[in-house]
Structure formats: structure tokens, C-alpha cells
Swiss-Prot record:
Name recorded for this polypeptide: Cytochrome b6-f complex iron-sulfur subunit
Top enzyme class: translocase
SS bond partners: 113-128
Intracellular or extracellular location(s): Cellular thylakoid membrane
Gene name per UniProt: petC
UniProt similarity note: Belongs to the Rieske iron-sulfur protein family.
């Protein structure tokens, strides 16, 4: 009987080593497959709009149309939409045909409560600890340490687009703390 000599070119892989490699590959594939939705959940989707903007959404998750948004609103009205990072954001009506060029993030800078607009007093009043903000979102009474964050509000194809505000805060003259 002839002896088969091993060549130096062919690696010697035993049955145990092959099964270990196969098991490792299978477990790795399953783990990566299970990890994909978790990673996708924490990375926000890139939305439409110029300059990295996000299309404003209504309470049902539908895009907000400017013409429908302005139908039943008057100058000075503020209405909540879902804005950047999913945060509630106030859109301010300028007149029957236009909105202001900024939106106001409705998250209180004290403890993160949603701050409602008080029409009677013409200011935002936090229900959690009494912080107050003027009509532009500038803090006028604590304990909130900072003004409400701003976002640019524009329209593209009748859709309201919100984009990050990175310029000087027009209310305080300071660099934006949220950028």
C-alpha cells in the first residue's frame, strides 16, 4: 500500500478544527443578523430636505403640508409638529401665507418636560417646575437654565422642513448651546 505524503502547500485541518470554524461562523452570522435591527434603531434615518433637514410630521406621522397647516391658523399661532430627532417642535405662523423662519423645540431645558404654549399669557409655561419662556422661547423665569432650542423652518414643495440651527441665537446673541 502506498503512503500518501502531505505537501507543504496543503494545510492540515482536522475534523475538530473544521467544526469549530463552522460553529464560530454560524454563531457570528446569527449574532450580526440579530444586531442589525438594534443598530438601525439607534441611527436616525436620513430624511428629505436640503441641508440635512427633516420633514415635519403631524401627530399621525404624516408629512406636514404648509397649505393645510395654515388653513385654520392665524398670525402668531403656534402648533406642535414632530421635528428634529423626533422632538416636539413649535411652528410659528407669521401670517395667512407663511410661517416664521424658525421653529422652537418644546423640550424644557430644566428636566425635559414638554412645554405648552399659554395663549392667554403669550408665553410658554412648563407644567413640571414653572419655568417660563417668552414667545420666541427665551427663558424669562427659572429654574430652566437655558432658552428653548431653535431649528430653521423652511418650505420645499409645500412641505415644512426643519433643519439644525447652528448660527448665533438671535434671542441672546450667544452661540447656540444645542449645536
Amino acid at each position: 500500500m502506498a503512503q500518501f505524503s502531505e505537501s507543504a502547500d496543503v494545510p492540515d485541518m482536522g475534523r475538530r478544527q473544521f467544526m469549530n470554524l463552522l460553529t464560530f461562523g454560524t454563531v457570528t452570522g446569527v449574532a450580526l443578523g440579530a444586531l442589525y435591527p438594534v443598530v438601525k434603531y439607534f441611527i436616525p434615518p436620513a430624511s428629505g430636505g436640503a441641508g440635512g433637514g427633516t420633514t415635519a410630521k403631524d401627530e399621525l406621522g404624516n408629512d406636514v403640508s404648509l397649505s393645510k397647516f395654515l388653513e385654520n391658523r392665524n398670525a402668531g399661532d403656534r402648533a406642535l409638529v414632530q421635528g428634529l430627532k423626533g422632538d416636539p417642535t413649535y411652528i410659528v405662523v407669521e401670517n395667512k401665507q407663511a410661517i416664521k423662519d424658525y421653529g422652537i423645540n418644546a423640550i424644557c431645558t430644566h428636566l425635559g418636560c414638554v412645554v405648552p404654549w399659554n395663549v392667554a399669557e403669550n408665553k410658554f409655561k412648563c407644567p413640571c417646575h414653572g419655568s417660563q419662556y417668552d414667545e420666541t422661547g427665551k427663558v424669562v423665569r427659572g429654574p430652566a437654565p437655558l432658552s428653548l432650542a431653535l431649528a430653521h423652518a423652511n418650505t420645499v414643495d409645500d412641505k415644512i422642513i426643519l433643519s439644525p440651527w447652528t448660527e448665533t441665537d438671535f434671542r441672546t446673541g450667544d452661540a447656540p448651546w444645542w449645536a
